[in-house]
């Protein structure tokens, strides 16, 4: 399987612009399967726009090496891709620890035995770009850095000087350089980039990135590197449990401006277990569709709180669905939506607590949670991994630890100690998780949906 990892020396070097532009440029003549290292939901939305193919996340905190390879294989085979292009996260070696590479781009590159292209912010650099390249190559000899892309060069003269330095002093080929251009930058908000689903200008912007790549990057050289990818180790582990719900169920999934943070394989795990996904909009539709369960992902409900609050028929239908004991699983923004209010505006009110946006990040971490109560997705006395990233908080005014399904071993959750409000058959948590972390997710949730029809 032909592939490449596009990584950077750090955050803010232009990885997403360059990676998405490369995906767009190559998609004109080839089938591209995009991937994103780490738990991010937003960058994959740009990949989807560039390629017309759902991007998949690869994460070594969530996945074993065998699961990383399986997830990569799933993506490549399901889309019949010619090339797999993997956008890294932060700097190449950044992970959860200063001394190992769990959660890093380097861990994904090694699990997939993939060639790597290093993106360098070349502002005011010439020979130092060569030094950076040498340092990144020297830290781990198992990382195969096959090329460099120079971003933010001042001029053609600057590019040629820096290219010569990297190729002669670091013995690494330079595939091209991108000059500074503020017109191609992306809008941002408190959780980072704005999802492509919200940006009306995204199609034109992605097209512009593709043109920029065609004009400045040696795509033939890049494809040659991918064509010569070394074999992937033939050791795979399943992403979800082979146990399969025999009964057919229907599961509602909101997907609109407010809610759009979902991992592709979470939805596939539900479909594997005979669930039919019914997409709907809590903003635009009048009520919940006729379903057996509800899965509310994250997003930006705080940005669209007025629209959500005005849709009273939808709020009432979801509250009644919970009161009727049908299973609901909600993550982060979904948790806020199920609270009494968001910033004082009425919401679903399954949980009688107020949620609000704050000016400071409240939780930004990989998480480890211990399950203390059975719930629609997990059984008591298990432990699972996830992540949290939120500027919001929920003002929990109760005093009973049994209100929660999870106790936090790593991360903040709702109270600093607990997460996963559980009422009726409704579970709502700040934790985002991936089916690789809990292989029985699809089976448990669909089984609960069937048993509580």
Curated annotation (Swiss-Prot):
Which reaction is recorded as catalysed by this protein? cob(II)yrinate + 2 L-glutamine + 2 ATP + 2 H2O = cob(II)yrinate a,c diamide + 2 L-glutamate + 2 ADP + 2 phosphate + 2 H(+); Ni-sirohydrochlorin + 2 L-glutamine + 2 ATP + 2 H2O = Ni-sirohydrochlorin a,c-diamide + 2 L-glutamate + 2 ADP + 2 phosphate + 2 H(+)
Residue ranges constituting the GATase cobBQ-type domain according to the UniProt record? 250-440
Q: Which domain of life is it from?
A: Archaea
Kindly state which keywords UniProt assigns to this record, in alphabetical order: ATP-binding, Cobalamin biosynthesis, Glutamine amidotransferase, Ligase, Magnesium, Methanogenesis, Nucleotide-binding
Q: Which residues form the active site?
A: 332 (nucleophile)
| UniProt site (Increases nucleophilicity of active site Cys) | 432
Pathway(s) served? Cofactor biosynthesis; adenosylcobalamin biosynthesis; cob(II)yrinate a,c-diamide from sirohydrochlorin (anaerobic route): step 10/10
Residue ranges annotated as coiled coil are: none
Give the GO terms filed under biological process for this record: cobalamin biosynthetic process; methanogenesis
Q: What is its EC number?
A: 6.3.5.11, 6.3.5.12
Q: Which cofactor does it need?
A: Mg(2+)
Q: Which GO terms describe its molecular function?
A: ATP binding; cobyrinic acid a,c-diamide synthase activity
Function per UniProt:
Catalyzes the ATP-dependent amidation of the two carboxylate groups at positions a and c of cobyrinate, using either L-glutamine or ammonia as the nitrogen source. Involved in the biosynthesis of the unique nickel-containing tetrapyrrole coenzyme F430, the prosthetic group of methyl-coenzyme M reductase (MCR), which plays a key role in methanogenesis and anaerobic methane oxidation. Catalyzes the ATP-dependent amidation of the two carboxylate groups at positions a and c of Ni-sirohydrochlorin, using L-glutamine or ammonia as the nitrogen source.
- UniProt comment concerning the protein's domains: Comprises of two domains. The C-terminal domain contains the binding site for glutamine and catalyzes the hydrolysis of this substrate to glutamate and ammonia. The N-terminal domain is anticipated to bind ATP, and cobyrinate or Ni-sirohydrochlorin, and catalyzes the ultimate synthesis of the diamide product. The ammonia produced via the glutaminase domain is probably translocated to the adjacent domain via a molecular tunnel, where it reacts with an activated intermediate.
State the remark under miscellaneous: The a and c carboxylates of cobyrinate and Ni-sirohydrochlorin are activated for nucleophilic attack via formation of a phosphorylated intermediate by ATP. CbiA catalyzes first the amidation of the c-carboxylate, and then that of the a-carboxylate.
Q: Which family does it belong to?
A: Belongs to the CobB/CbiA family.
Name the UniProt record assigns to this protein: Cobyrinate a,c-diamide synthase
Its source organism is Methanosphaera stadtmanae (strain ATCC 43021 / DSM 3091 / JCM 11832 / MCB-3)
């Amino acid at each position: 399987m032909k592939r490449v990892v596009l990584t950077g020396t750090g955050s803010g070097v232009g990885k997403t612009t360059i990676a998405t532009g490369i995906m767009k440029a190559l998609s004109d003549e080839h089938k591209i399967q995009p991937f994103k290292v780490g738990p991010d939901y937003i960058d994959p939305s740009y990949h989807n726009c560039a390629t017309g193919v759902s991007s998949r996340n690869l994460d070594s905190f969530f996945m074993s090496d065998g699961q990383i390879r399986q997830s990569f294989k799933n993506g490549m085979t399901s889309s019949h891709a010619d090339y797999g292009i993997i956008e890294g996260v932060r700097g190449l070696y950044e992970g959860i620890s200063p001394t190992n590479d769990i959660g890093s781009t380097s861990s994904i590159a090694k699990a997939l035995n993939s060639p790597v292209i290093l993106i360098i912010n070349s502002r005011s650099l010439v020979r130092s770009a060569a030094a950076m390249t040498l340092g990144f190559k020297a830290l781990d000899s198992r990382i195969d850095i096959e090329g460099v892309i120079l971003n933010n060069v001042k001029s053609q003269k600057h590019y040629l000087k820096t290219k010569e330095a990297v190729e002669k002093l670091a013995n690494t080929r330079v595939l091209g350089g991108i000059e500074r251009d503020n017109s191609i930058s992306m809008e941002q908000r408190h959780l980072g980039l704005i999802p492509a689903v919200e940006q009306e200008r995204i199609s034109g912007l992605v097209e512009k990135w593709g043109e920029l790549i065609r004009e400045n990057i040696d795509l033939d050289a890049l494809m040659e590197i991918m064509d010569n990818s070394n074999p992937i180790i033939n050791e795979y582990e399943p992403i979800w449990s082979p146990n399969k719900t025999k009964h057919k169920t229907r599961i509602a999934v909101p997907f609109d401006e407010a809610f759009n943070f979902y991992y592709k394989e979470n939805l596939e795990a539900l479909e594997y277990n005979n669930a039919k996904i019914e997409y709907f909009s809590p903003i635009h539709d009048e009520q919940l569709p006729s379903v057996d369960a509800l899965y509310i992902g994250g997003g930006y409900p705080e940005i669209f709180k007025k629209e959500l609050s005005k849709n009273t028929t939808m709020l009432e239908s979801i509250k009644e669905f919970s009161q009727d004991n049908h299973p609901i699983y909600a993550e982060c923004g979904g948790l806020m939506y199920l609270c009494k209010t968001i910033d004082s505006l009425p919401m679903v009110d399954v949980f009688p607590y107020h949620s609000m946006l704050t000016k400071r990040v409240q939780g930004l971490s990989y998480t480890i949670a211990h399950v203390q109560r059975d719930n629609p997705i997990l059984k008591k006395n298990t432990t699972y991994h996830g992540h949290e990233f939120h500027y919001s908080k929920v003002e929990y005014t109760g005093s009973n630890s049994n209100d929660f399904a999870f106790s936090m071993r790593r991360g903040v959750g709702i109270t600093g100690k607990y997460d996963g409000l559980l009422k009726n058959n409704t579970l709502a948590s700040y934790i985002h998780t991936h089916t690789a972390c809990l292989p029985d997710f699809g089976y448990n949730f669909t089984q609960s949906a069937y048993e509580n029809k």
